[in-house]
């Protein structure tokens, strides 16, 4: 029988944003970034209360359909505990539907909050599994759970009945590497952006991406001078250019100037990885074009503070 947690127990979760793919690593590479959502979760005597401040305020649901709430419930079930009621307060800094892992961060925050309330019975691998299940792929969620950069993959059981297993290992990123995000003022639908991808690619393009993905793992760890080459891609970004023309224009413009720029996740955010600051004139041009400029560091793992 599940243990009922005491009323008044509270946790505060701080979860980082993430950038997925990093160019060639489609649904594989992820990077945690120093832009954070904070979620406070308290056990109450009955019902459900949800508040949202910041990004998504007035747009996100305030009931059990909120992704954080769904993830909390999944985490509580996995930990074999239950609660009479919940109060959930979300302070969001991660832009919604911009390719910065906002939905993965919500899932991670919920599972991590439940884990903290239950006394941390779930290890990192289980938190990655539960939070990735909401996404269907682990690159963003694993980065937010584990911090730094991750190489992630999905194992499909041969019996066809067991749920997919989402796995990840971390890459310790060279401390010289920083990130600059150029965030457009419009949303991108992950599903819509995925629909433009072909069902098949050439062996030549597959080989190209395998090599660049390998280069990227080395670039992140020890050789940041290889970031430009390591962010080259032929599997997804060329096909998405027509549906994200502003993003494609800026990625090409930056890469032509030697910057390791790529489409972050499903977009529309443009991400630049660098060891030297991006030219201020370029950033001013981006601002004048309506892009929000965010200077970011590589982030550590999600953190959970038990308040009571």
Swiss-Prot record:
ATP binds at residues 95-105. GO terms for biological process: threonine biosynthetic process. The gene is thrB. GO terms for molecular function: ATP binding; homoserine kinase activity. Belongs to the GHMP kinase family. Homoserine kinase subfamily. The keyword Amino-acid biosynthesis applies. The keyword Glycosyltransferase does not apply. GO terms for cellular component: cytoplasm. Its EC number is 2.7.1.39. Catalyzes the ATP-dependent phosphorylation of L-homoserine to L-homoserine phosphate. InterPro entries: GHMP_kinase_C_dom (IPR013750), GHMP_kinase_C_sf (IPR036554), GHMP_kinase_N_dom (IPR006204), GHMP_knse_ATP-bd_CS (IPR006203), Homoserine_kinase (IPR000870), Ribosomal_Su5_D2-typ_SF (IPR020568), Ribsml_uS5_D2-typ_fold_subgr (IPR014721). It catalyses: L-homoserine + ATP = O-phospho-L-homoserine + ADP + H(+). This is Homoserine kinase. Its main location: cytoplasm. It comes from Corynebacterium diphtheriae (strain ATCC 700971 / NCTC 13129 / Biotype gravis). It is found in: Cytoplasm. Pathway: Amino-acid biosynthesis; L-threonine biosynthesis; L-threonine from L-aspartate: step 4/5. Keywords: Amino-acid biosynthesis, ATP-binding, Cytoplasm, Kinase, Nucleotide-binding, Threonine biosynthesis, Transferase. Disulfide bonds: none annotated. Pfam families: GHMP_kinases_C (PF08544), GHMP_kinases_N (PF00288). It is an enzyme of class 2 (transferase). Gene3D superfamilies: 3.30.230.10, GHMP kinase, C-terminal domain.
